[in-house]
Swiss-Prot record:
PROSITE patterns (alphabetical): RBFA
SUPFAM superfamilies the UniProt entry points to: Ribosome-binding factor A, RbfA
GO cellular component: cytosol
GO MF terms, alphabetically ordered: ribosomal small subunit binding
Quaternary structure and interacting proteins, as annotated: Monomer. Binds 30S ribosomal subunits, but not 50S ribosomal subunits or 70S ribosomes.
Keywords (A to Z) from UniProt: Cytoplasm, Ribosome biogenesis
Record-given protein name: Ribosome-binding factor A
Family membership noted in the UniProt record: Belongs to the RbfA family.
Role, per record: One of several proteins that assist in the late maturation steps of the functional core of the 30S ribosomal subunit. Associates with free 30S ribosomal subunits (but not with 30S subunits that are part of 70S ribosomes or polysomes). Required for efficient processing of 16S rRNA. May interact with the 5'-terminal helix region of 16S rRNA.
């Protein structure tokens, strides 16, 4: 059963990415990337994780509203392509791992820069 769930999650991820790029015309969703999908064991719910290019809270709220508005259309279009009896209910959650990774990368670069400055002063 786990193999089937993983296959359906991959199929939903692939199809939602296509739908978001080709069929949804909401300008609020231009910078959104679907990063992962997790389905419940009975495939009744699918948690869709997304990331954005910005960390602006106002933009984040706009994107959440845009995804909520487009949820019905996305589910309908998914139903036309998925090979499951019932299309899962979509739940959108922000994937903060990309932003967290970017923040860690900036901190590492700052430390490297400070180390270089200290080395140059000691010479």
């Amino acid at each position: 059963m786990k193999h089937r769930i993983g296959r359906v999650e991959g199929e939903i991820l692939r199809e939602l990415t296509k739908i978001l790029r080709k069929d949804i015309r909401d300008p609020r969703l231009n910078d959104v990337t679907i990063t992962a999908v997790e389905c419940t064991n009975d495939l009744s719910y699918a948690t869709v994780y997304y990331s954005m290019l910005t960390d602006d809270p106002a933009k984040e709220k706009e994107v959440a509203e845009g995804l909520d508005k487009a949820k019905g259309m996305m589910r309908h279009l998914l139903g036309q392509t998925l090979t499951v009896y019932k299309v899962p209910e979509l739940i959108f959650k922000r994937d903060t791992s990309v932003a967290y990774g970017s923040k860690i990368d900036k901190l590492i670069n700052q430390v490297k820069k400070q180390d270089q400055e200290r080395e140059n002063k000691n010479k």
